[in-house]
Each structure stands twice: as structure tokens, then as C-alpha cells.
């Protein structure tokens, strides 16, 4: 019976010890206060914890518990018997060393369009460099297709069409010149071929009006071809 009556009396004693030890815990780290200081509002802190709290909130220095104003001059150090009698606020709390993570170095990959195998080699993913007008993989095929685009453009058809008439005019001039030295029959025969079609292998005489028109049309269609090429690149 004595043991049964003694057991209930031990439980309140242990709980009271926990309550007593909790009174001396830091309100920030919830551990036994080291270099203890008490704020004017009555809350206990470790000076290293409170100093870090104030340093990280320079524009909002309030008590972590009741949000009243607090700073290093508004706390009172607690000196226990047999402990250090120096003011903990004069100590600089140990701070962790700053760790700055350096970004990985970015090396220029060069003009290795085909990956690891070089410009023409394969085996790796294609490298894309954006210049604002599309990728390089799309730019180079269009550059190589430019002569082909000029070939299939109506330029060749228009030049040959107007060139046939120019060749006929040149043949007319040659026929008239030959008629002066020959007889009338030869002149009539040559003059009959004046308006005929120009041969496919002949071209307009340099400096003639037809040659200038051919050059003008060639430049126009060349500009149109360049315009379409840039339109394909940008759009």
C-alpha cells in the first residue's frame, strides 16, 4: 500500500522539474539559454540567437514572442553563480562562413554543327544557335538552295522570252547589212527572217536596249528572290 501511495507523488515532482527547466529555455532555439539575456518585456533568449534575429531583421526589430520593440540595448544579461561575469553583448556571436557557389564555366562550343563528330560528322545532337532569324540548321540549307531558287524562278523564262525578240532584231540588222553588198533577192531573203525567232544559243548585243531590259528584269527578280528568302527566314 505504501508503494501505491508513493507513485502518484513522484509524477507531479517530475512534471514540476520539467516546468522549472522550461523557464530557462531560449524562446528562439527552445534549448537551455547560453549567454542568457532577458528583454524588457520579460522573455529569455540566448544572446547568439537574439543577435542573429536582430541582424536578419534590421528594419523590424521586435521581440519574437510578443512583438514589442527590442534591440541590443534593451536586454539585460543574466549572470549565474560560478559563471562568466562578462557581458555577452560584447562578444561577437560565431557566424557561419559565407558559401558562394560559382556558376559552371561556359565554354564556347565553336562551330561544331554536327555534334561531337565535327562539322560534317554525326553521332551527336544537332547544335542550335539562335541569331534571331532561326536556327543554323535551317539557315544553311536555305543558303545552299539560293542558286536553285534563282534557277526555278520565272527569271529564266522571262529572260529567254525577251531575248528571242532581241535576237530577231539583231538578225534584222545583220540582214540589212548583207543586203547592201548582195543582190535584191538576197536582201529580200534576209529581210524575211528579220521578225523570226531568235536562236536559243544567241544573246542580246551588249549595250543594246534589249540587253538593258534583260539586265533590269534580272535585277528585279533577283531582289524578289532575296525578299522571299528573307521572308522564309524571319517568318
From Swiss-Prot:
Localization: Cell junction; Cell junction, Focal adhesion; Cell membrane
Keywords annotated in UniProt: Cell junction, Cell membrane, Membrane, Metal-binding, Transferase, Ubl conjugation pathway, Zinc, Zinc-finger
Pathway where this protein functions: Protein modification; protein ubiquitination
KW Transferase (keyword) present: yes
Primary location group: other
Zinc finger intervals, RING-type: 26-67
EC main group: transferase
Deleted gene: phenotype: RNAi-mediated knockdown leads to disorganized muscle dense bodies and abnormal muscle-muscle cell boundaries. Accumulation of unc-95 in the muscle cell bodies.
EC code(s) of this entry: 2.3.2.27
Region (Disordered): 77-115, 173-208
GO molecular function: ubiquitin protein ligase activity; ubiquitin-like protein conjugating enzyme binding; zinc ion binding
Keyword Transferase tagged: yes
Compositionally biased intervals (Basic residues): 188-198
Reactions that this protein is recorded to catalyse: S-ubiquitinyl-[E2 ubiquitin-conjugating enzyme]-L-cysteine + [acceptor protein]-L-lysine = [E2 ubiquitin-conjugating enzyme]-L-cysteine + N(6)-ubiquitinyl-[acceptor protein]-L-lysine
InterPro entries per record: RNF5/RNF185-like, Znf_C3HC4_RING-type, Znf_RING, Znf_RING/FYVE/PHD, Znf_RING_CS
Biased segments, Gly residues type: 173-182
Gene Ontology biological process: ERAD pathway; inductive cell migration; molting cycle, collagen and cuticulin-based cuticle; protein ubiquitination; striated muscle cell development; ubiquitin-dependent protein catabolic process
Similarity comment: Belongs to the RNF5 family.
Job of this protein: E3 ubiquitin ligase that plays a role in the maintenance of muscle cell boundaries and muscle dense bodies, which establish the adhesion sites of the muscle cells to the extracellular matrix. Ubiquitinates the LIM domain protein unc-95, thereby regulating its dislocalization from muscle dense bodies and weakening the link between the muscle cells and the hypodermis. Regulation of unc-95 dissociation from muscle dense bodies by ubiquitination plays an important role in ecdysis during molting. Plays a role in the cessation of distal tip cell migration at the end of larval morphogenesis.
Protein name as catalogued: E3 ubiquitin ligase rnf-5
Amino acid at each position: 500500500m505504501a508503494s501505491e501511495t508513493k507513485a502518484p507523488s513522484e509524477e507531479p515532482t517530475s512534471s514540476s522539474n520539467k516546468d522549472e527547466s522550461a523557464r530557462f529555455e531560449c524562446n528562439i532555439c527552445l534549448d537551455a539559454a547560453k549567454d542568457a539575456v532577458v528583454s524588457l518585456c520579460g522573455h529569455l533568449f540566448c544572446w547568439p540567437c537574439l543577435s542573429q534575429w536582430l541582424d536578419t531583421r534590421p528594419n523590424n526589430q521586435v521581440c519574437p514572442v510578443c512583438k514589442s520593440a527590442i534591440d541590443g540595448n534593451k536586454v539585460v544579461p543574466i549572470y549565474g553563480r560560478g559563471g562568466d561575469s562578462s557581458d555577452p553583448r560584447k562578444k561577437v556571436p560565431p557566424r557561419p562562413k559565407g558559401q558562394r557557389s560559382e556558376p559552371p564555366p561556359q565554354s564556347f562550343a565553336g562551330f561544331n554543327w554536327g555534334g561531337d563528330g565535327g562539322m560534317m560528322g554525326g553521332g551527336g545532337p544537332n547544335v542550335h544557335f539562335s541569331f534571331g532569324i532561326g536556327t543554323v540548321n535551317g539557315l544553311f540549307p536555305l543558303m545552299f538552295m539560293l542558286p536553285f531558287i534563282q534557277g526555278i524562278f520565272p527569271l529564266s523564262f522571262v529572260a529567254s522570252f525577251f531575248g528571242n525578240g532581241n535576237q530577231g532584231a539583231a538578225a534584222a540588222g545583220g540582214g540589212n547589212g548583207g543586203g547592201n553588198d548582195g543582190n535584191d533577192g538576197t536582201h529580200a531573203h534576209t529581210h524575211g527572217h528579220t521578225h523570226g525567232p531568235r536562236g536559243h544559243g544567241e544573246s542580246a548585243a551588249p549595250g543594246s536596249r534589249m540587253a538593258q531590259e534583260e539586265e533590269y528584269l534580272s535585277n528585279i527578280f533577283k531582289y524578289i528572290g532575296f525578299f522571299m528568302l528573307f521572308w522564309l527566314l524571319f517568318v
